């Protein structure tokens, strides 16, 4: 059977560890960790300025230790962890930010709270969500943890931003919104409960009242003839937990430094002898409130432990997976660094080849270049213009010169064919460029998909540069090859193709008297348009044959010179150069993204926190 001390102490230890790591709730964004703090049951003390909130806390502790003054005094959350010690032991306090330093003078505790507040917020009345942790060890307290939050206010004082009221409420809400937060709502009895800032906020976040404890202060300051029974007995505002009345020290008592133990006795006497509240005396006062909260907190902790363990185990799994993805810290040994770089290059190369071979998307775009882009480009070549009747007549005439051809204008044919074949250079080079750009995109995509490389932006840049440099060399070789294919077609025409064409001798054009035209007539006048159309048709047929050939051979050249080489030797030059580098240069390639290094460190710290918390819970024999 677990004890109240062990359960509340367990939560105290986990809370302190959370604060050290910066986990005090309110984490947002895709990179935010699960907040262990928010899963822990807490008691948040909420009240307006001058509600008597500080006096209630001091009554529970039995010590005068909180800063006092006008305006906003509490400007950072104060996590107050109370530890009951054996009777006769000396009281002392410890701050989380001053480990192993014990304060026995509680006036110095007050000063340190003020100084530590100013260290974060400055002295200009600003507020901060970063909590101060204060542990008090005393035989006069119960085991309990309370979070003192800044007092709710409506107006800003000099030196504060105009949004201070909204800022404070927003901070308070980050605590009380959480389902594991117990709300201790402090309201003064000498004001209408309907106007209580604490009750308004509690009702907003806890409309059923199951998480709210109402505390009514300043009962002794109410007008004569009036009392607060309507509230204390739950008739004017009902909560699921009983209201507790408190009588704090008067300002005169505070000025005289009246002992808190004496103040407790006076409070008990007030309720015991009060004609209005005597019947409620056993359930009134700061001592009863402390015991009530301690018992309830222990009960809530016991109930929540299974869900806390579930969150911890889930978070441990997620963090371990993330750390695996990010990889271990980089080795400092040059040999190990070189091995790490080569392993990552091999991982990249594997992914790159998978894109080309169909294991991943992207390689099909190269086929699209050959099956769609190249044929479309070949169809768009201006052969119709080149082989128009006017163009054929002009080229044949220029090829004949001063001696017209006798039967077939061979020189004209050759000029027409060579001119037409020159157009194939454009689609050939465009195919090479298109394949090059696909390969470059696959390099970029493969680098981004290589998990191991994500840690090292410098290596990513150098690897991309090396791969693209190799692709550029492959492109140049490929262009030479495809241009060579076109030039080969121009260099030697297939005469057999023309021998198989139907042969028709064109008869010279005769004059009206059935006489042959004069030899001195222009060449173009010797043959009819049909002769030149037949030449254009023959040349077109030959060009189409060459086009079909190039449509098959250009892809072969691109694949052989670019795709095949990219698979075989994309990083060969990089490998030869990287092995010559010294340790410092290798280390520069393995400089990680600072954000990633920070994330790994945070993950490792958070993982340590969760594992420690799990061990702490396992060490407590709590009853399920």
UniProtKB/Swiss-Prot annotation:
Positions carrying N-acetylthreonine: 2
Organs and tissues of expression: Ubiquitous.
Entry GO MF terms: GTP binding; GTPase activity
Stretch list, region G4 motif: 217-220
Any GO BP annotation: defense response to fungus
Region (G2 motif): 73-75
Family: Belongs to the TRAFAC class dynamin-like GTPase superfamily. Dynamin/Fzo/YdjA family.
Residue ranges of the region described as G5 motif: 247-250
Start and end residues of each stretch annotated as G1 motif: 47-54
Record key words, sorted: Acetylation, Cell cycle, Cell division, Cytoplasm, Cytoskeleton, GTP-binding, Hydrolase, Microtubule, Motor protein, Nucleotide-binding
Annotated stretches, region: G3 motif: 148-151
Residue ranges constituting the Dynamin-type G domain according to the UniProt record: 37-306
Assembly behavior: Forms homodimer and may homooligomerize and heterooligomerize to form the phragmoplastin complex. Binds to PHIP1.
GO cellular component, one term: mitochondrion
Catalysis: reaction(s): GTP + H2O = GDP + phosphate + H(+)
SMART domains (alphabetical): DYNc, GED
Source organism: Arabidopsis thaliana (Mouse-ear cress)
Entry protein name: Phragmoplastin DRP1E
Enzyme class, UniProt record, top EC level: hydrolase
Domain annotation GED: ranges: 532-624
EC number, as in UniProt: 3.6.5.-
Cross-referenced CDD domains: DLP_1
PANTHER family: DYNAMIN, PHRAGMOPLASTIN DRP1E
Covalent S-S links between cysteines: none
């Amino acid at each position: 059977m677990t004890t109240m001390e062990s359960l509340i102490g367990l939560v105290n230890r986990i809370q302190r560890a959370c604060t050290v790591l910066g986990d005090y709730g309110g984490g947002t964004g895709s990179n935010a960790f699960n907040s262990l703090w928010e899963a822990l049951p807490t008691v948040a003390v909420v009240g307006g300025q001058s509600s008597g909130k500080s006096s209630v806390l001091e009554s529970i502790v039995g010590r005068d230790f909180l800063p006092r003054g006008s305006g906003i005094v509490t400007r950072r959350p104060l996590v107050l962890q109370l530890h009951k010690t054996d009777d006769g032991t000396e009281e002392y306090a410890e701050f989380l930010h001053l480990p192993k330093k014990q304060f026995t003078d509680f006036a110095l505790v007050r000063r340190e709270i003020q100084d530590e507040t100013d260290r974060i917020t400055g002295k200009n009345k600003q507020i901060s969500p970063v909590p101060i942790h204060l542990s008090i060890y005393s035989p006069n307290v119960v085991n309990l943890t309370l979070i003192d939050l800044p007092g709710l206010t409506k107006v800003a004082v000099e030196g504060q931003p105009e949004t201070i009221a909204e800022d404070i409420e927003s901070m308070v809400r980050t605590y009380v919104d959480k389902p594991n937060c117990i709300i201790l709502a402090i309201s003064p009895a000498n004001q209408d409960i309907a106007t209580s800032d604490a009750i308004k906020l509690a009702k907003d976040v806890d409309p059923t009242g199951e998480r709210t404890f109402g505390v009514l202060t300043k009962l002794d300051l109410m007008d004569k003839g009036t009392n607060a029974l309507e509230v204390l007995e739950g008739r004017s505002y009902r909560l699921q937990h009983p209201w507790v009345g408190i009588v704090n020290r008067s300002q005169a008592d505070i000025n005289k430094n009246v002992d808190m133990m004496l103040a407790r006795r006076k409070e008990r006497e007030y309720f015991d002898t009060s004609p209005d509240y005597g019947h409620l005396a056993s359930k009134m006062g700061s001592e009863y409130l402390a015991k009530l909260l301690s018992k309830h907190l222990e009960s809530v902790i016991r109930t929540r432990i299974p869900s806390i363990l579930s969150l911890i185990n889930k978070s441990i799994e997620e963090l371990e997976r993330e750390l695996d993805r990010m990889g271990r810290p980089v080795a400092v040994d040059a040999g190990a660094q070189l091995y790490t770089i080569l392993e990552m290059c091999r991982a990249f190369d594997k992914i790159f080849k998978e894109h080309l071979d169909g294991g991943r998307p992207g390689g099909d775009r190269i086929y699209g270049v050959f099956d769609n882009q190249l044929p479309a480009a070949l169809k768009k070549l201006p052969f119709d213009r080149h082989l128009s009747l006017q163009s054929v007549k002009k080229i044949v005439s220029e090829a004949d010169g001063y001696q017209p051809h006798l039967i077939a204008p061979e020189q004209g044919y050759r000029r027409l064919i060579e001119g037409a074949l020159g157009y194939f250079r454009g689609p050939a080079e465009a195919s090479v460029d298109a394949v090059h750009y696909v390969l470059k995109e696959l390099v970029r995509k493969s680098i981004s998909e290589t998990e191991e490389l994500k840690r090292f932006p410098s290596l990513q840049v150098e690897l991309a540069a090396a791969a693209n440099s190799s692709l550029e060399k492959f492109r140049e070789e490929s262009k030479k090859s495809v241009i060579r294919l076109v030039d080969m077609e121009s260099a030697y025409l297939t005469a057999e193709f023309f021998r198989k064409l139907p042969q028709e001798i064109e008869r010279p054009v005769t004059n009206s008297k059935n006489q042959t035209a004069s030899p001195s007539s222009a060449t173009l006048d010797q043959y009819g348009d049909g002769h030149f159309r037949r030449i254009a048709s023959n040349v077109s047929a030959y060009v189409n044959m060459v086009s079909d050939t190039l449509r098959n051979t250009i892809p072969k050249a691109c694949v052989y010179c670019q795709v095949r080489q990219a698979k075989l030797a994309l990083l060969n030059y990089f490998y030869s150069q990287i092995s010559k580098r010294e340790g410092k240069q290798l280390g520069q390639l393995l400089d990680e993204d600072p954000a990633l290094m920070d994330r790994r460190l945070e993950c490792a710290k958070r993982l340590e926190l969760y594992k420690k918390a799990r061990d702490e819970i396992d060490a407590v024999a709590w009853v399920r």
